[in-house]
Design a protein with these regions (language model features):
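Extended hydrophobic-aromatic, low-complexity segments
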Residues: 73-75, 85, 97, 152, ...
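Hydrophobic alpha-helix feature that most strongly marks membrane-spanning transmembrane helices
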Residues: 93, 104, 153-156, 160, ...
Length: 174
């Protein structure tokens, strides 16, 4: 017999159910968000061959592993995109709101080796109230890349600890 089990905090499910019931609707079934996300855009070929779908949330990163058109594993690591903003704020000594704006408007996870000699700085409009700092885009992207790499390593370790798949031969969608 096939068994699929996903654990969640009971209070979170109860809260969601109460909100939906208050709208005079009812819950027929629950589905793990990353699983639903994967099914919404993955091709059948990906599902057959094996794929990992990774969803960076604000406070956590969730992932789903699909093999042979079946959900094999879901998991969560306790770091998300908000941790990137916190890292930027701490390292650059700026407010968290400014760090979030910089991350969204100017941040990149890939560090372009071709522009290391050409130093570009963040635009002034990202800094409110005359709080401008001369910060290089390379510095910002290095901070972002470091945290994203750490999060992806945590996902990798969780998947490998269950000996689910040979990750090197599978596609990964972020």
């Amino acid at each position: 017999a096939d068994i699929h089990a996903v654990l969640a905090e009971h209070s979170a499910i109860d809260n969601l159910k109460n909100i939906i019931n208050s709208c005079e609707l009812s819950v027929e079934n629950y589905i793990f968000g990353t699983y639903a996300l994967g099914l919404s855009f993955l091709k059948q070929e990906d599902l057959n061959d094996g794929v990992i779908c990774i969803d960076f949330g604000k406070d956590k990163t969730s992932f789903a592993v699909f093999e042979n058109s079946t959900l094999s594993y879901v998991g969560v690591v306790p770091y998300g995109s908000n941790q990137v903003s916190k890292d930027l704020a701490k390292v650059l000594d700026i407010k968290i709101e400014v760090a979030e704006r910089i991350k969204v408007e100017s941040g990149e996870c890939v560090i372009n080796e071709n522009i290391k000699d050409k130093i570009e700085y963040l635009p002034v409009h990202l800094f409110p109230d005359d709080d401008f700092r001369k910060i290089s885009k390379t510095m910002v992207n290095t901070i972002i890349n470091s945290r994203i790499e750490e999060i992806l390593q945590l996902v990798y370790r969780k998947i490998k600890s269950y000996n689910l798949i040979d990750i090197k031969t599978k596609k990964i969608y972020l």
